Amino acid sequence: MGNKFRAKMSKARFEIGDHEKHVISVNANPFLKYIRIEVDGERVIDVPNLVPSRKFDLEIGNAEKHKVEIFIRLLSPVRLMVDGSEVVQI
């Protein structure tokens, strides 16, 4: 259970966009109590995580804009919604 479980609950990568691609990386470490979110390698969120669940709203893209919602819950996989539809991790 060790590494596989830890990776599933603390790190996730998603690719969004049809013509304008973006990669969203989420690192939510419940033991060190921080959340870091990067878009295309640039850190956009770096906050302490002191509660069991958090939601972050972002707008991503230039020509192709997307409303992104990131849901982080303790001991659960990270969920990402883009324009109301769930995105699968890469």
Residue ranges and their predicted role:
Residues M1-I90:
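Cysteine-centric segments in proteins
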